[in-house]
Curated annotation (Swiss-Prot):
InterPro entries: aa-tRNA-synth_I_CS, Anticodon_Met, Met-tRNA-synth_bsu_C, Met-tRNA_ligase_1, Met-tRNA_synth, Methionyl/Leucyl_tRNA_Synth, MetRS_core, MetRS_Zn. Zn(2+) binds at residues 147, 150, 160, 163. Is required not only for elongation of protein synthesis but also for the initiation of all mRNA translation through initiator tRNA(fMet) aminoacylation. Keywords: Aminoacyl-tRNA synthetase, ATP-binding, Cytoplasm, Ligase, Metal-binding, Nucleotide-binding, Protein biosynthesis, RNA-binding, tRNA-binding, Zinc. Homodimer. Its cofactor is Zn(2+). The lineage of its organism: Bacteria, Pseudomonadati, Bacteroidota, Flavobacteriia, Flavobacteriales. It comes from the Bacteria. One of its GO terms (molecular function) is metal ion binding. The keyword Transmembrane helix does not apply. Belongs to the class-I aminoacyl-tRNA synthetase family. MetG type 1 subfamily. Pfam families: Anticodon_3, tRNA-synt_1g, tRNA_bind. This is Methionine--tRNA ligase. It comes from Christiangramia forsetii (strain DSM 17595 / CGMCC 1.15422 / KT0803). A motif ('HIGH' region) lies at residues 15-25.
Length: 691
């Protein structure tokens, strides 16, 4: 374990460019990675925080086919959206790269060639699924079927997104082509494989022994399960035309498998950054005094904890990751996030609909971070955390301090008198917070760390509430100077240690307190809070109060919930499958049915039942009683006068002691609600027959 690293290489999982960034990506990977990187920089560490767009693989070619464009068109579109979203959200990558770029192609090709020349691969002929209609092999997501582990009928050829199991396409039960829907055949092809089974002893020693105490339990547990089940050789090449061409003899028509190509993107991104900054990239990947940390979601654990480390080990020149603090999944309003189903809160849309409120989303996502188990994002919780915590605690404290300092002293920090016991205790608590928060961040407990940040704001609020300077100002002006001086120390500390969590708020607060320019060496940093006598001195001029956070109203939340309901309805309609046709009926069978328009003239819910309603229906030939199972869908008073379609010559049937003399025709909408089948034209009278 590297306890005193000289530098840090921080990677965030490469987002896949077949769609924009959503809150699940942010909570799982990018917000915690950004908190960690900002924190390290504030401690003076040499940090390379890299990421980039993952632009190869089958889903992109499928999307391109559907949209009638090239794969390059698809990745160009989404790379632009993703990169701008990250920039606007304040994610401070030192470099954001692209795997379709030349630096990456060269780096990945060289990586493969060295392993090939060193004899690290095995070459085998295997039978792969092949679509005869499309005339191509079905790699990865070109094929779907039933997962052999959990029974999910929509598993992909590389992974089941329901249980997280990594698969080969030939593992699927009842596979079918995602291109044509055809049942594929098996056809022989030749590929290179990484023999993971040859590295089991290395992985057991390195992970199961070496990282048992410092890796997160969810990560360690999944890795142990994989190793215990026994590892198999895994193909590193694919029969595709989109990707990095296999750079050795026999590689025609083949590309590097995206799981092999993508993590090398961290190295190529570091190269781009180092070249731009005039630095040597190699120490960030090859020096034992560098700490390498991968931030990922749980669906990437196997790639970053087993496969990529084996690649690095087999290559021979690279360091191994010190930690892989993978998060679980974030759900949305109790349902799993889905890009394909549009069940998501998209970052670029959030930034448009909630301008200048990046920190609110950062705060809520960190507060609900799925660090060891899946967690849920709800708009109700989003509103509550903003209004009850950011506005009522953090914002309220800062506003009171700055307003009172301007009111009593024209914005000039007062000189303090002798500290009381409560002052001493408050300052001592203040000075302890940086190390407490640092300890949580260093252990990748970002939710816990942010909770302590809010506790510091609570400390400030409680201090002011207990000391009541607005009352004392009339009787003890000297005491008020000391109170405001102590409160300003807390406000100043908040401006510093909020930066990793709430960077936009931190910048506003520093400006409000008129802190030294951030480019200066004298700018307060993390450690200064616990070591410096005072963070803001008597005689210092601060600025005017500005609201750091605004209350979020119910109407804003209703708008977001309506968007989700519209998505839910659209998905239900798309998923609605027609009932299979019943057996053939003759024309004579049809003519036996007396279908006619009726009007409901009375309605009441049947006592002691949930579903049944007793209706009196005017059929044009008589008024009759019909018992219908519609009580859970309609109120009696709402359907009186409603025109309906009645099967009038159905044999009477007794239901709960009431004779039912017909049947009302109904259907279901996409949400499962019953709908009357009735004429939509006015002037159709009761008794009109339906032919």
């Amino acid at each position: 374990m590297n306890k005193n690293p000289q530098r840090f290489t921080i990677t965030a999982a490469l987002p896949y460019t077949n769609g924009p960034i959503h809150i699940g990506h942010l909570a799982g990977v990018y917000v915690p990675a950004d908190i960690y990187s900002r924190f390290l920089r504030m401690q003076g560490y040499d940090v390379a925080f890299v990421c980039g767009s993952d632009e190869h693989g089958v889903p992109i070619t499928i999307k391109a086919k559907k949209e009638g464009v090239t794969p390059q068109d698809v990745v160009d579109k989404y790379n632009g959206i993703i990169k701008k979203s990250f920039e606007d959200f304040g994610i401070t990558f030192d470099n954001y790269s692209r795997t379709s770029g030349k630096t990456h192609h060269d780096t990945a090709s060289a990586f493969f060639k060295k392993m090939y020349e060193d004899g690290k691969f095995i070459e085998e002929s295997t039978e792969q699924l092949y679509d005869e209609e499309a005339g191509q092999f079905l790699a990865d997501r070109f094929v779907t079927g039933t997962c052999p582990k959990c029974g999910n009928e929509e598993a992909y050829g590389d992974q089941c997104e329901s249980c997280g199991t990594s698969l080969n396409a030939t593992d699927l039960i009842n596979p079918k082509s995602a291109i044509t829907g055809a049942v594929p055949t098996l056809k022989e092809t030749r590929h290179w494989f990484l023999p993971l089974d040859q590295y089991e002893d290395f992985l057991k020693e390195w992970i199961l022994k070496g990282h048992k105490s410092d890796w997160k339990s969810n990560v360690y547990g999944q890795v142990k399960s994989w190793i215990d089940d026994g590892l198999r050789a895994r193909a590193v090449t694919r029969d595709l035309d989109w990707g990095i061409p296999v750079p050795v003899e026999g590689g025609d028509g083949k590309v590097l498998y995206v799981w092999f190509d993508a993590p090398i993107g961290y190295i190529s991104s570091t190269k781009e950054w180092a070249e731009r900054e005039g630095k040597d990239w190699e120490p960030y990947w090859k020096d034992e005094n560098t700490k390498l940390v991968h931030f990922i979601g749980k669906d990437n654990i196997v790639f970053h904890c087993i496969i990529f480390p084996v690649m690095l080990k087999a290559h021979g020149d690279y360091i191994l990751p010190e930690n892989v603090p993978a998060n679980e999944f974030l759900n949305l309003e109790g349902k799993k996030l889905s890009t394909s189903k549009n069940w998501a809160v998209w970052l670029h849309e959030y930034l448009e609909e909630f301008p200048d409120q990046q920190d609110v989303l950062r705060y809520v996502l960190t507060a609900n971070a799925p660090e060891t188990k899946d967690n849920d994002f709800t708009w109700k919780d989003f509103q509550a955390r903003n209004n009850n915590e950011l506005v009522a605690i953090f914002g309220n404290f800062i506003n009171r301090v700055v307003v009172l300092t301007n009111k009593y002293y024209n914005g000039i920090v007062p000189e303090p008198g002798a500290y009381s016991e409560i002052d001493e205790k408050t300052i001592a608590e203040l000075k302890a917070y940086p190390s407490v928060i640092a300890s949580s961040i260093e252990r990748y407990r970002f939710r816990e760390a942010q909770g302590e940040l809010m506790n510091l704001a609570r400390l400030g609020n409680k201090y002011l509430a207990d000391e009541e300077p607005w009352k004392l100002i009339k009787t003890d002006e000297e005491r008020v100077k000391t109170i405001m001086y102590v409160a300003l120390q807390i406000a100043s500390a908040l401006s510093i240690i909020s930066e990793p969590f709430l960077p936009f708020t931190s910048a506003k607060l520093k400006k409000m307190l008129n802190h030294v320019d951030e480019s200066s060496d004298n700018t307060p940093d993390w450690d200064i809070i616990g070591t410096k006598e005072a963070l803001i001195l008597g005689g210092h001029q601060i600025g005017k109060a500005e609201l750091l956070f605004s209350k979020i109203e119910d109407e804003q939340m209703e708008k977001q919930l309506e968007k989700l309901e519209a998505t839910k309805t659209a998905n239900a309609m798309e998923d609605q499958k027609a009932e299979p046709q019943k057996e053939i009926a003759t024309f004579e069978d049809f003519t036996k049915m007396d279908l006619r328009v009726g009007t409901i003239i009375e309605a009441q819910k049947m006592p002691k039942t949930k579903k049944l309603m007793v209706l009196k229906v005017d059929t044009g030939i008589d008024q009759r009683t019909v018992v219908s199972g519609i009580a859970e869908h309609f109120k009696a008073e709402d359907i009186i006068g409603k025109k309906v379609t009645v099967l009038a010559n159905l044999a009477p049937r007794k239901l709960r002691g009431v004779d039912s003399e017909g049947m009302i025709l109904m259907t279901e909408n996409a949400e499962g609600k019953l709908v009357f089948v009735n004429p939509d034209e006015d002037g159709v009278k009761a008794g009109t027959t339906i032919n």
